[in-house]
């Protein structure tokens, strides 16, 4: 990936609240299925904003930091998705999204970020990201002290 897009905690919360507004009224949803690991934090934020207590996970391994590899479903929520929001942080190439669509054909699939190749596979997303851009999520970064430019 040639470009990077850095997401802060504040930005993520703002984007999740924007997504929650699109998902109102909350009463239409039975629960949330968060795609582990990228969808865990957005899923928690959506659960809070929508007052949803039923939160489950589908655990899929497809990345080692910035390298996509074969899809491996480690755990799935038992349902066809009807009445559920499935949330992930991002749709990229669409490989994971296609698997999600097959597992939960009746779910409402949302992501915070969407790249062109995967965009048609989600029902809602908030931010367009170019295909060649790597997203640095806040849970993958640490906050560190940076010396002033004119520091002593």
UniProtKB/Swiss-Prot annotation:
Record-level GO cellular component terms: cytosol; plasma membrane
Subcellular location: Cell inner membrane
Cofactor: Mg(2+)
Pathway it works in: Purine metabolism; GMP biosynthesis via salvage pathway; GMP from guanine: step 1/1; Purine metabolism; XMP biosynthesis via salvage pathway; XMP from xanthine: step 1/1
Sequence similarity: Belongs to the purine/pyrimidine phosphoribosyltransferase family. XGPT subfamily.
Quaternary structure note: Homotetramer.
Descriptive protein name: Xanthine-guanine phosphoribosyltransferase
Species per Swiss-Prot/TrEMBL record: Sodalis glossinidius (strain morsitans)
Phylogenetic placement of the source organism: Bacteria, Pseudomonadati, Pseudomonadota, Gammaproteobacteria, Enterobacterales
Gene that encodes the chain: gpt
């Amino acid at each position: 990936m040639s470009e990077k897009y850095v997401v802060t905690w504040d930005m993520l919360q703002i984007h999740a609240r924007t997504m929650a507004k699109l998902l109102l009224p909350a009463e239409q949803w039975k629960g949330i299925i968060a795609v582990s690991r990228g969808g865990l934090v957005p899923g928690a934020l959506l659960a809070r904003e929508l007052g949803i207590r039923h939160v489950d996970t589908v655990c899929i391994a497809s990345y080692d930091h910035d390298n996509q590899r074969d899809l491996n479903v480690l755990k799935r929520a038992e349902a066809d998705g009807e009445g559920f929001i499935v949330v992930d942080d991002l749709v990229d190439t669409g490989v994971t999204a296609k698997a999600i669509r097959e597992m939960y054909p009746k779910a409402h699939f949302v992501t915070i970020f969407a790249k062109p190749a995967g965009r048609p596979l989600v029902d809602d997303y908030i931010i367009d990201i170019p295909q060649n851009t790597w997203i640095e999520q806040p849970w993958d970064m640490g906050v560190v002290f940076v010396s002033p430019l004119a520091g002593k």
